[in-house]
Amino acid sequence: MGKGRAFFEGSRRLACGAELHPSFTFRSPIARILAVNKGEDPQVSSSTLQSNIALPEKREITTTPRLSDRIFRGVVTGGGLSSLVILGLILIFLAYEGYNTLKAQGIHFFTGSKWAATTGANGHVDFKASHFGIAAMLIGTLICATIAVLIGVPIAVSASIFLTFYAPQAVKKLAVTVIDLMAAFPSILFGLWGYFVLDPIGVYWAKLIHKYFNWIPIFQMPAGPYFDRSPLIAGLILAVMIIPIVTSISREIFAQTPLDRIQAAYALGGTKWAMIKNVAFPYARSGVVGGTMLALGRAMGETVAVYTVLNIVYQINWHILLGAGGNVASMILLQFGDASQEEVKALMAAGLVLFAMTLIVNSIANLIVNRSVKGRS
C-alpha cells in the first residue's frame, strides 16, 4: 500500500472512530512540524495518535423546528387563511342578504330587465310583486368586458414583446415603471379622464364606424344617433385599465423563455420575429391566456369608471355605439344611494351574482396559469 493511500485509509478509520493498524505512521507534514515544535518525535505511532487526538462528538440531527420558525410559519399560514376566511364571509353575507330576493324572483332575476320595487300594504317592499331583473346589466357587463379584452389584450401583448425582446434597457426600465404606476391608478381618475378626454374622441370614431360599417348589426343605431357615453366608450376605458395587468403578466412569461431554445432558433438561421413566433409565443401562450382571464375579471367588476362614462339604461342593448347600457357593478352603485332596506337586499343578490362571475373567471385564470407553470417546469 502506498504512503498516500495508507494515509487516507488511516484518516478515514480515525474519523469513523475505528482502531488504527499498529504499523500505521502519521507522516503528514503539518503533524511533523507540530511535533517538532513540541519537542516530540515526528514519527507518531498509531496508538499515540489515537490517544492524543479527541474525536468530535457525534452530531444529533433533529427535525423539530426552532421557535422563531414556528412563529413565522404560524403568521404566514394565518395570513393565507385569513384571505380565504374573508372571502368566505363575504360570500355568506351576500347569500344571506340576497336569499329572499332570489327565492321570490326565481329565474326572472336573471332573465328580466326591469328594476322596480313595489311597496306593500305594510309599507315594506313586496318581493313577489316587485320586479328585480339584471339581464340587461349582465349582458352589458359581458359586452363592455369583451370590448376591453378585444382592444386591450393585443396592445398589451405587443407592448410586452417589445419590452422583452426589443426595447433598450433604459426605455424598458422607464416603461415598466409607468405601467406599474398605471395599474395603481384609482378608478375615478380613469373615469374622469375618459369622460373629458376619451369620450369626445370615442364619439368621433363611433360616427366613422357607424358610417362605414353600419351593415354589421352591432354597429347599427336603431334608436337615433346617440353616440355619447356608449358601451364602446366604456370598453375603451376598461381596455386602458387592463393593459397594465396583461402587459406585466405577459412580460414576465416571455422573459422566462428558455435561453437554449432562443439560441437554437438563432442557430437555425431564424430571425428575431421567427424566434418570437415559433418559440416565445408557444411557450407563453397559456400564461397570456391566464393573464387575459384575470383582466376579464377586472373588467367585469369595474364600477366607478364605467359609471362615469356610460349611460345606465335598464334595457338590453346589443348595439355598442348606442349611448345606453350598463353593468352590474355600476347598477348597484346607481341604486344603492336611494334604495330602501328591502331593496338593498335585492342589490346584495345582484352583488352575489357578480361575485360568482368574477370568482369563476379568476379561478379559471389561476388554473390556466398554474398549468402553464407546471408544464414549463
PLM segments and residue spans:
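Transmembrane alpha-helical segments of polytopic membrane transport and secretion proteins
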Residues: 3-8, 13-16, 22-80, 365-377
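Periplasmic/extracellular loop-to-transmembrane helix junction in inner-membrane transport proteins
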Residues: 58-70, 74-75, 95-148, 168, ...
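Membrane-interfacial helix termini and adjacent extracytoplasmic/periplasmic loops
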Residues: 104-135, 190-240, 320-322
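Hydrophobic alpha-helical transmembrane segments of multipass integral membrane proteins
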Residues: 135, 139, 143-151, 155, ...
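Transmembrane-helix boundary motif in ABC transporter permease subunits
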Residues: 148-179, 365-371
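Transmembrane alpha-helices
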Residues: 178-181, 185, 189, 246-253, ...
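C-terminal transmembrane helix and the adjacent membrane-cytosol boundary/short C-terminal tail
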Residues: 251-255, 259, 266, 334-377
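Glycine-rich helix-loop "coupling/hinge" segments at transmembrane-helix boundaries
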Residues: 296-341
